Amino acid sequence: MNTLTEPKADGIGDSCRRNSRPTGVLREWRLVPRGCFAKAASAGWILLAGPRSMNSTILTAIARLGERGAVRVLDGGNRFNAYTVARAAHGRPEVLERITVSRAFTCYQMLSLLERTPTIQVPFVVLDLLSTFYDESVQVGERKRLLRACISHLNRLEQAAGGVVSVHPPAVPNPAALELLDILQSAAMDTFHVQMATPAPEPMRLF
């Protein structure tokens, strides 16, 4: 395991612990900006696991990718904020037009989105993939089946272009959620465990 230390909080975070799958080599992922979000220059997909506070930086990175070309966003946790992306793109319509967004509100819809996503040379970003899989009204075994089916489509899509998948911990940790994360992490080419910088406390004012 390698530890990446970022000098400032304008990246995803101050530190990212990286786990690499022994098979497969990620030839060129560039940090955008100086965090653990990357642009794929070769086939593969990476997993970003961390707090929800990292989402705004991921959206900024999506805007950066849009500056270079088309990018597909699949939103599993209603995390895509068009205003944040537009601000990061400085309101340039040509950048925003290159970003396509699809949303899923159940784990079944997430699988359906991935099934319908064509295998083309356009990088993809899946936001908060496990959000809908935390739904306890769906049996754990069924959630695992759906997740493995989603992974098969991520692997299909990575053959044409790289991608990034983000996940956040559930509000209430539980064994089923951890098992789902383990399944996803085992399938990813690389995993970055993101820790956001904690702002320094303001000094106490006596007067």
Regions found by a protein language model. Give the residues of each.
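Amphipathic coiled-coil/heptad-repeat helices and related helical stalk/stem segments
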Residues: 33, 55-58, 110, 150, ...
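Conserved P-loop
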Residues: 39-113
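Detector for small/aliphatic-rich hydrophobic stretches
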Residues: 1-71
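Phosphate-binding/switch region of NTP-binding enzymes
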Residues: 157-207
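Phosphate-binding/switch loop-helix module in NTP-utilizing enzymes
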Residues: 104-156
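Short, well-ordered secondary-structure micro-motifs
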Residues: 83-85, 112, 135-138, 176-178
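Hydrophobic beta-strand segments of well-ordered beta-sheets in folded domains
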Residues: 43-46, 68-74, 121-127, 161-169, ...
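Anion (oxyanion) recognition and catalysis
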Residues: 65-66, 155-159
